Structures are given as C-alpha cells and as structure tokens.
C-alpha cells in the first residue's frame, strides 16, 4: 500500500506525499525493529533522519528524500513489507537511513514541520500520519484506513517484541509514552500496515537500506544504541514505529538525541525529526491544519521526545479526532483517510464523508442561502425533492468549520421543506379555474402584500401553519381533494374570489396557487386566509384581493428571491399564461371579469400542466414535437407485419435499433429468420 501510494506521491513529489512516505516508513520500521540487530540500530540511527516506519503508508519519496536512491526504491518495499517484527535490523537501518544529505531534498516537504526542532518531530509525525491517512494523496488515503487497522492488530505483537529491544532506555521511555498515548492505536494500525507488506521484502529493503544508511550515517558512535532504542520502541509499541520514523532533517541526530525517544533522536538536529511520523493516523491535511502544532505531530504512536511533545501528541490526536480529522475534512476524503482508530473513535460525523470526492458541494450550498426561494419556487418536485436529497448530503458537503452552521441552516430549511414541499409541490388544482374556491383565507402570496389592503393583518400571520388554511377552506373541495397542501392554494383562491367566486377565483387560483406552492406561502396562508375570509367584501374586497394576490405573489417572489409565480410560469408554460395574464391583470387592477375570464379559461395548475396538453395522441398529424420516432411508431403500428414474424422479433429489433441509436429500422426487412 505504502508503495503504491508512494509511487504516485513520488511523481507528485508533494510535501504531503513526502510526509506520507515518512509515516509509512517509520511505521514499517518499528514492525521490523524488534529483530533489528545492534548494528542495524546503529545503521538505523545513521539513517535516523530518514527513518520511516514500515507501517506508515506514504510516498517512499518523502522519507527517502534523505536518501533518494535507497529511500525511493526501499521505501516502497518497506511500505510493501509491513511485517512488524520480521524486518531485520537492516530495515530499521533503512528507516534510519541517514537523511542528512537527503534532508535538503526532503526539506521542501518536511521543512515546514521541521522548522521547530523540538516540535518538528511531532509535527512531521502528524504530517506523516496525515499523508498516511491520505489527506494529502487520495491514494494514500484509501489504503491508509486498512493499514491502520492492520497496524492496530499487529501493534500488540510489536509491543511484545519491543520489551526485548528495550536495551535503550530512551526507547523504553518511548514505549511507555505510546502506551499512554492515544496514538498507540495509530501505531497498531501502522504495524498492521507493515504486516500487510511482506516482511521479507521489507527486511531486504531495510537491510540494504540499513547497510547503506549505516555506512552513510556511520560516524555517529551511538548509532547502534539509537538503532536499538528505535527498535525497542518500535517493537514495544506501534508507537515506536513513529519514533522510528526518525526525521529526515538535515542535521543528524546526535547519539544523545538518539538515546531519547526515536523522535528525540531524530531530532535535536532534525528539528524534531520532521520525519517523525506518527502512525498513519494523522492525515497530512490534519497536520497542515494544525500547522506547527507539534502535538498534532506528536499524535503518532505516543512517542514522547525528550521535548515531551508526545504528551501533546495525545491531546492533539484527540483534538484532531474531535475535529473529525480536520486535516481529513480539509483534505479530501477526510473521514476515510482518518486512521481506523480515529475513524472509530472520532468519526468525522459533522459531515458525511465521501471517500473519493470532496464533501463540499457548491451546488448544495447555495440552496442553503436560497433554500426558501428554491423550495417555494421549485416546491414542485424538481427542486423540492432534490433539496431534500441535498439535505442528506448536506452534512458531508462543506468544510468542517462551516458544517455546524451549514448543518443548522440546512437542517432548518430542509426540515420545513419536507412538510412544506410535499403540500406545495403540486398545489395548484385544476378545479380552481372554473370553481372559485371560497376558502376565505387569501393566498399566501396575497397575504404578504396584504399590507396594502385591510386584510394586511393576515399578512402578519404567515407563520400560521399551512394546515390552518385548510379548515377555513369552504367549498374548496376540488382544491382540498387535489392535495393536502392544496388547502393553502385553496385559501389563496378563496381569498381572491371570496365574493366573485367564478370571476376572481380563476385569477386568484392562477396567481395565488403558484404563490401558495412555496412553503412560505403555504405557511402564511392560514392566518392571512382567515383574516381575509372574515372580511370577504364583494367587489371591493375582490379587487383588493385580486390586487393583493398578484402583488402578494410578486412580493413573495421578491422575498424569496425566486418568484413563486414567476418561477412557476417558466416551469409550466400553461401556468405562465394563466398566472401572467390572469394574475397580471388582477394585480394591475384589470377588470375582475377580464382577470377572471383569463384565469378561468386558462388556469393550468403546475401539476396539471403535464396532463393538460390538448394533444391526446402521437399520430402522424401531430406536430413533430408530439410525434413518436419513426422506429417507435413503426413498432407500435405495423400494418403489414401482423404475423409475418413473432412479436418478440419486432421487440428485439426495436430494442436493437434503439440501442444502436438508429432512427428507423425496417420491421420486415430482416424477418428471414
């Protein structure tokens, strides 16, 4: 896994990848470390800067930077060979590959984290972990989760071996820290990842790398001790793996520093051994997010460098987990990238996580802001249902910080959406045309503009639930029957045509129904409708209502940002005419008769529009848009093909023609069979 990830990373050469590589290297090394020989420890120390844990999955390039030759090839191998204990000291040595020369190379990636010597290690660790998580690279990300689990499983094994390698006190210290720290799970994960890789390969690479590293790094007498220490820490706990990931920092770890936890060893000079990769638990994104925060880096296996950054590591890890893998969220598939322990302990619950894609959905977010408009405007299914779906996806979209706010806004609007959307979706009942629904409540849209007319008070009650209008509805049976939400429209219509049911009703229905469709409108309908119902004046009231209705619709449109009426018109051509003509007339103050006639004649409720087309057949005389494709029509009506071939033959041919995209196929031509 590490190898695969590392290769893509190597190509990219991104810091993330490098960090990932380091993390993987460090993890793997610990796995092998228990078996590492004293000489191997020395080599490892020599390589200390470039050491990477076997378990960590990251581009080998990152760790390798210290030793581009050895690290690039060996790193992948190491990644591939995750055997925790099998890797020989050579592997440890490879892990410790002297990164001083490569450090410069690595610096681009680790420099950030390495800047602080003390905190650098934890930070690098975090980076490694982050990369391991796959924050930086999707490839690493995906494999990482599995690796963490594996590491977790094998961690106990590593821990058991660790005690024997305890020869180095510092190493011993490191193991305790891992035990204490939450990062242990990370180390375990790393170990698992390491185990996943074949031990032999890992060992071979490590040995070759270790030897090379030993030669390169040789010159630090305490290297052997350091190596042992690293080995002990690694074996003791998956945590050591992180420790092992010594740093790639240019400065070699002095033996003294090596004595300290591996992280310390990697870094007094390495700046905390930016390479210090904690278990793959920390995602690159996470590390970056936490930035210089060494604790985040410390998150790794709980190694505590002499600086005692590790203790922070525990906290940072918890914090990161709490944040839901900030890095992860920030990165791309944050949740998946988070190591298994992190994922289990702290799912990135705030937002659903899509392993492959960014959680943010720009198309989803805007609805939040405009949700009302869209909902009201598109209450009809297209927008409403999708909106709800968006709600489902809402959590994942958007970055973690916004997720709280987003969630609430989404939540609020969405919750209303189901109730409001369902009713308003197709609230315009055909009955409204001829039959003025007497429900007194004015249309919701009318209600908002109610301010101009005396019924303005009802406008204030818009909060009233849409259900309220239903009770007031008098003879809006058609509307009521049409739909539960219909009551709202019914009220609107009744309000429009309380006195002139037939004349005003159509107009009201046309103008108000669209308005009613919006959830807001529906909500407003109850109080407004009731208020208007109370004062149903014959003509004056009618006019007022009529004016109100169109005005209300306009007002709603303005308020919603999407006109309840306007959007409806575009959505449904028939509605546009009725709304536009009737509603426009009403609002303009066109004679009630004119408005009513228009509305009555052509008020097509949005839901009705689909079925209301006068074209009842797909015959040849129909215009082109209504005609069926030649092949379909031929299939449906075959005057000459009655029984020449079994029906299934025609079906097969038709299916074939459709699949092939043929515009026409001859039913008779190929019936030879």
UniProtKB/Swiss-Prot annotation:
Region (Interaction with GGNBP1) residue spans: 125-506
Function: May be involved in spermatogenesis.
GO biological process: cell differentiation; double-strand break repair; embryo implantation; gamete generation; protein localization; protein-containing complex assembly; spermatogenesis
GO cellular component, one term: cytoplasmic vesicle
Tissue and organ expression note: Testis-specific. Specifically expressed in the germ cells and not in the somatic, Sertoli, or Leydig cells. In adult testis, expression starts in stage VIII pachytene spermatocytes, increases in stage IX and X pachytene spermatocytes, and culminates in stage XI diplotene spermatocytes and the meiotic cells in stage XII. Expression decreases slightly in step 1-3 spermatids, further decreases in step 4-11 spermatids, and is no longer detectable in step 12 spermatids and beyond. Isoform 2 is mainly expressed in testis.
Highest taxon listed in the record's lineage: Eukaryota
Protein name: Gametogenetin
The keyword Zinc appears for this protein: no
Organism: Mus musculus
Biased composition (Low complexity): 70-83, 257-268, 413-424, 504-531
Entry keyword Ribonucleoprotein: no
Residues found modified as Phosphoserine: 399
Region annotation (Disordered) ranges: 1-599
Basic and acidic residues: compositionally biased ranges: 14-30
GO molecular function: identical protein binding; ubiquitin protein ligase binding
Pfam family, one: GGN
Record key words, sorted: Cytoplasm, Cytoplasmic vesicle, Developmental protein, Differentiation, Nucleus, Phosphoprotein, Spermatogenesis
Biased composition annotated in UniProt, kind: Basic residues: 542-551
């Amino acid at each position: 896994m590490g190898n695969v990830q590392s290769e893509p990373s190597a190509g990219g050469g991104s810091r993330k990848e490098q960090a990932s590589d380091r993390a993987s290297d460090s993890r793997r090394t610990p796995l092998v470390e228990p078996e590492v020989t004293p000489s191997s420890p020395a080599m490892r120390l020599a390589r200390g800067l470039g050491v990477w844990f076997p378990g960590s999955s990251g581009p080998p390039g990152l760790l390798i930077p210290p030793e581009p030759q050895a690290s690039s090839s060996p790193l992948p191998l190491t990644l591939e060979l995750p055997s925790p204990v099998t890797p020989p000291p050579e592997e440890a040595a490879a892990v410790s590959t002297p990164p001083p020369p490569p450090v410069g190379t690595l610096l681009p990636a680790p420099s950030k984290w390495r800047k602080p010597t003390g905190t650098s290690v934890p930070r690098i660790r975090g980076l490694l972990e982050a990369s391991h998580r796959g924050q930086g690279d999707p490839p690493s990300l995906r494999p990482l989760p599995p690796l963490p689990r594996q590491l977790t499983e094998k961690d106990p094994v590593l821990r058991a071996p660790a005690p024997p390698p305890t020869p180095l006190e510092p190493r011993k210290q490191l193991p305790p820290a891992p035990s204490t720290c939450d990062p242990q799970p990370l180390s375990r994960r790393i170990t698992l990842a390491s185990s996943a890789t074949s031990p032999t390969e890992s060992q071979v690479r490590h040995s070759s790398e270790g030897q090379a590293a030993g030669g390169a790094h040789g010159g630090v007498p305490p290297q052997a001790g350091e190596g042992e220490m690293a080995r002990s820490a690694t074996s003791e706990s998956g945590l050591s793996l992180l420790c092992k990931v010594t740093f790639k920092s240019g400065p070699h770890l002095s033996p003294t520093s090596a004595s300290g936890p591996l992280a310390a060893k990697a870094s007094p000079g390495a700046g905390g051994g930016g390479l210090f990769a904690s278990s793959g638990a920390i995602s690159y994104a996470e590390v970056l997010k936490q930035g210089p925060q060494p604790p985040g880096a410390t998150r790794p296996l709980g190694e505590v460098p002499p600086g005692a950054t590790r203790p922070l590591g525990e906290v940072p890890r918890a914090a990161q987990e709490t944040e839901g893998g900030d890095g992860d969220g920030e990165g791309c598939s944050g949740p998946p990238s988070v190591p298994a322990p992190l994922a289990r302990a702290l799912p990135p619950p705030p937002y659903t996580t899509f392993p492959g894609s960014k959680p943010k959905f720009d198309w989803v977010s805007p609805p939040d802001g405009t949700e009302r408009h869209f909902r009201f405007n598109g209450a009809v299914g297209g927008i409403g249902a999708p909106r709800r779906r968006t709600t489902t996806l809402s959590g994942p979209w958007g970055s973690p910080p916004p997720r709280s706010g987003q969630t609430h806004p989404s939540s609020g609007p969405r919750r209303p959406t189901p109730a409001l959307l369902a009713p308003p979706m197709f609230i315009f009942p055909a009955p409204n045309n001829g039959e003025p629904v007497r429900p007194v409540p004015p249309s919701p849209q009318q209600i908002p503009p109610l301010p101009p007319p005396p019924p303005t008070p009802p406008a204030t009650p818009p909060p009233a639930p849409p259900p309220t209008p239903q009770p007031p509805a008098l003879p809006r049976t058609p509307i009521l029957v049409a739909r539960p939400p219909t009551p709202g429209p019914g009220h609107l219509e009744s309000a429009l045509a309380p006195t002139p049911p037939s004349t005003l009703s159509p107009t009201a229905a046309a103008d108000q129904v669209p308005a009613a469709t919006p959830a807001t409108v529906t909500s407003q309908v109850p109080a407004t409708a009731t208020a208007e119902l109370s004062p149903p004046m014959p003509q004056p009231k009618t006019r007022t209502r009529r004016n109100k209705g169109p005005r209300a619709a306009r007002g709603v449109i303005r308020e919603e940002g999407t006109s309840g009426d306007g959007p409806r018109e575009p959505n449904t051509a028939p509605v546009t005419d009725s709304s536009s003509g009737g509603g426009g007339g009403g609002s303009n103050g066109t004679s009630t008769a004119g408005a009513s006639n228009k509305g009555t004649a052509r008020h097509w409720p949005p839901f009705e529009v689909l079925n209301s087309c006068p074209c009842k057949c797909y015959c040849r005389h129909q215009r082109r848009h209504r005609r069926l494709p030649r092949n379909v029509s031929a299939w449906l009506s075959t005057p000459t093909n009655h029984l020449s071939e079994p029906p299934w033959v025609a079906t097969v041919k038709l299916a074939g023609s459709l699949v092939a995209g043929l515009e026409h196929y001859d039913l008779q031509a190929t019936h030879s069979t």
